[in-house]
């Protein structure tokens, strides 16, 4: 996964649940002191990697990484880490983005992040990983959001989003047996959700 990576300025790790902690430690050993974030999840390049590992390396950038702990109850307690990281990198909306990986409760995390990012008009991209674990700079966390401010030293950078879904009036679903804390839907229109999607 790291073949050809020689002098990275920032690294993103995507691994599987069984090997995540091992891959985090190996990445830190191979590239000590290089800012990194990681999570459990799939990755895509020319094919989909579900049970393996992928590493994305950045050059020509500066990166500052940190963590918001206690994501499930009070990520705002660690908001000063976001502020300090922004100051350290001297972020600008023209050349800096924020990338984050969360273990869950992303609604509270996003509210916390946006309370700072909106002031500077810094874009955010990222997601919630699987398995309840994320990493930053070689340390694995549970119940946390790891983030990186990535500043392009040679130009601009932007985050774009596209909604690939569109309204379809012939379908209406009533969700039940939901768990808001885990963002799960048990049933749609009285059928198991998995079955409803397959139909």
Question: Model-derived features: where do they sit?
Answer:
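Small-residue-enriched flexible segments
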Residues: 1-20, 26-30, 34, 39-199
